């Protein structure tokens, strides 16, 4: 069987993205046919910063229609509008290739959200762009690994805004889309308030979550969704034995336990999208960029998910 062709966007070049591309190419090319969306000149510069430890001529790289950012010992690890613009154009090109079926999927390396903002990119990050590009699809951010996957009902929104987002109709739509995308038989749903609201004692949000769970199970015809569970104990070992699939109302409630348990191996998956997209479950790691310290396990798992 022919290997799948995967477009890999470079992420912010001042971080660990190019380092991961170079150090992982041999393993990645054994899994798929990688197409690196970055100019060859930048790969050469990155290799020089890594003391020419890697072979760059064997990499299939596609030049990006954007000004080349500076990349040297004085720019690495720093936020740059030019690097932000370049990482966005790399990502956008990946989506275009996936839309036209020129690649089978895309893997995105980490971007810096402040760099995107400085470059006046009107999106918070990758997932926000996908939600705008594919408005007819309910794009769901799911992070994790085979041992634990967490779907986020809300992702990059202020915590104070989450309460108003928790409405029965919207949550039912989300839960059904999550189940359809994952084919999970059991999904544990975390509550929003302490003790999952204590039957209405602490806020009304958990009552709405319960109604959404009941309606979703009724639609499916079986008891798929369990909860709302008190979030402080939802990820205890005995709970994780029930199912690897969870839903969290907010970003940190779901991702704090995930990253405490499986930080190095977790990935980010965009569910319910018309294209296949995964990403590493870590940021640009500016503090260790170009020091040969970047762990590539998350990156390789993101590729394996697509391949």
Swiss-Prot record:
One of its GO terms (biological process) is pyridoxal phosphate biosynthetic process. It is an enzyme of class 1 (oxidoreductase). SUPFAM superfamilies: Isocitrate/Isopropylmalate dehydrogenase-like. It catalyses: 4-(phosphooxy)-L-threonine + NAD(+) = 3-amino-2-oxopropyl phosphate + CO2 + NADH. It is found in: Cytoplasm. It comes from the Bacteria. Pathway: Cofactor biosynthesis; pyridoxine 5'-phosphate biosynthesis; pyridoxine 5'-phosphate from D-erythrose 4-phosphate: step 4/5. Its cofactor is Zn(2+); Mg(2+); Co(2+). Keywords: Cobalt, Cytoplasm, Magnesium, Metal-binding, NAD, NADP, Oxidoreductase, Pyridoxine biosynthesis, Zinc. InterPro entries: PdxA_epsilonprot, PdxA_fam. A divalent metal cation binds at residues 156, 195, 251. Substrate binds at residues 126-127, 259, 268, 277. One of its GO terms (molecular function) is magnesium ion binding. Its EC number is 1.1.1.262. GO terms for cellular component: cytoplasm. Catalyzes the NAD(P)-dependent oxidation of 4-(phosphooxy)-L-threonine (HTP) into 2-amino-3-oxo-4-(phosphooxy)butyric acid which spontaneously decarboxylates to form 3-amino-2-oxopropyl phosphate (AHAP). Belongs to the PdxA family. Homodimer. The active site is located at the dimer interface. This is 4-hydroxythreonine-4-phosphate dehydrogenase. It comes from Helicobacter pylori (strain ATCC 700392 / 26695). The lineage of its organism: Bacteria, Pseudomonadati, Campylobacterota, Epsilonproteobacteria, Campylobacterales.
């Amino acid at each position: 069987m022919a290997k799948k062709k995967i477009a890999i966007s470079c992420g912010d070049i001042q971080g660990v993205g190019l380092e991961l591309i170079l150090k992982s190419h041999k393993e990645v090319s054994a899994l798929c046919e990688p197409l690196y969306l970055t100019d060859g000149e930048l790969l050469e510069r990155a290799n020089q910063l890594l003391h020419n430890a890697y072979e760059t001529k064997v990499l299939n790289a596609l030049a990006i229609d954007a000004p080349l950012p500076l990349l040297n010992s004085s720019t690495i690890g720093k936020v740059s509008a030019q690097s932000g613009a370049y990482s966005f154009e790399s990502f956008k090109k990946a989506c275009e290739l996936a839309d036209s079926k020129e690649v089978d999927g895309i893997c995105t390396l980490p971007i810096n959200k402040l760099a995107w903002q400085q470059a006046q990119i009107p999106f918070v990050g990758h997932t926000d762009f996908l939600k705008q590009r594919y408005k007819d699809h309910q794009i769901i951010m799911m992070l994790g690994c085979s041992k634990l996957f967490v779907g986020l009902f809300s992702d990059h929104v202020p915590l104070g805004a989450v309460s108003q987002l928790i409405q029965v109709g919207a949550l039912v739509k989300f839960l059904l889309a999550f189940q359809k995308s994952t084919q999970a038989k059991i999904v544990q749903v975390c509550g929003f308030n302490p003790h999952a609201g204590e039957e209405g004692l602490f806020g009304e949000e958990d009552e709405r979550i319960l109604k959404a769970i009941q309606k979703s199970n009724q639609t499916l015809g079986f008891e798929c969704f369990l909860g709302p569970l008190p979030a402080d104990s939802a990820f205890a070992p005995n709970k994780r034995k029930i199912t690897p699939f969870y839903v969290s109302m907010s970003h940190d409630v779901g991702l704090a336990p995930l990253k405490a348990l499986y930080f190095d191996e977790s990935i980010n998956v965009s569910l319910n999208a018309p294209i296949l997209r995964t990403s590493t479950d870590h940021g640009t790691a500016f503090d260790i960029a170009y020091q040969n310290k970047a762990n590539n396990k998350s990156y390789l798992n993101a590729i394996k998910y697509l391949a």
